[in-house]
Amino acid sequence: MEPKAFVEIMRPHNCILAGIVGILGSLVAYEGIPPVQKLILIFLVVYFGCSAGNTINDYFDVEIDKINRPNRPIPRGAITRKAAFYYGVLQYFIGLIIALLLGWSAFLFALGAYFLTFVYAWKLKPLPFIGNVTVALLTAATPIYGAVGVGRIDLAGYLAICAFLVNVSREIMKDIEDFEGDKRLGARTLPIMIGKKKSGIIASIFGFLTIISSFLPVKVGIGLGYLPIIIVDIMIAKASIDVLVNPEKAGKGQKILKFATFIAVISFLLGALTREV
């Protein structure tokens, strides 16, 4: 086994981004700077939930990854499947212990979200559209968790709406990208069930709904630091139009949405910090 595989299988860059979104949810909801120790705990709970979910996902997805992503740790033999499973369970356990430090509401929320990540990887992922929506719900739950961690929801709900919509779009694009491998293994993803073209239309609809939803925070007085969201909207529009015209561009489109999400996180953070309370 390769020691670096234990880091790689977590996909830390994705988990760091998720942790930042959790912190952002707390900042937006708190209308100020929450206690630093709470922000650290929120980040860690989200990080370990994300990393555990990624690890368990690779455990269940090993056959598909042999075709679609052969360079991932398990298919290339860098870590055994059994070791990956127990490693994922360990990460869940660490995250839940940390969640207890935030209180029972935060613990129960984390427990529910963690359970959903496991069930998604185990049973829900192959189901057409249901799997996509589940991932989007988990992503939307991230800023809400940050808000729960500081004891209020407030504006974090708007961030959750945007996160949900853009991730439904991205998950469908990823399924279009993985069409051949999924079809060979008998998966029942949305593109396989209704075709790439119709799936591209649905992905683009959710993309444009994200753009519309991105204006909701303006209505409630988010700060001028939110202006970079214009760049995000342009990127989402491009990805949505591309996949609408040519579904074969879904792979490029989902990467654009991933980068756009990163910029959106920064935009929401700056907007929250520059808002007049």
UniProtKB/Swiss-Prot annotation:
Indicate yes or no for the key word Membrane.
yes
Q: Specify the pathway.
A: Membrane lipid metabolism; glycerophospholipid metabolism
Keyword list, A-Z: Cell membrane, Lipid biosynthesis, Lipid metabolism, Magnesium, Membrane, Phospholipid biosynthesis, Phospholipid metabolism, Transferase, Transmembrane, Transmembrane helix
Transmembrane portions of the chain: 16-36, 40-60, 93-113, 129-149, 153-173, 199-218, 222-244, 253-273
GO annotation (BP), single: glycerophospholipid biosynthetic process
Cofactor(s) listed = Mg(2+)
Q: Which GO terms describe its molecular function?
A: geranylgeranylglycerol-phosphate geranylgeranyltransferase activity; magnesium ion binding
Work out whether the entry's keyword set contains Zinc-finger.
no
This enzyme's EC code(s): 2.5.1.42
Principal place of residence: membrane
Q: Where in the cell is it found?
A: Cell membrane
Q: Which domain of life is it from?
A: Archaea
Query: What is its membrane topology?
Result: Multi-pass membrane protein
Q: Which GO terms describe its cellular component?
A: plasma membrane
Family that this chain belongs to: Belongs to the UbiA prenyltransferase family. DGGGP synthase subfamily.
What's this protein's name?
Digeranylgeranylglyceryl phosphate synthase
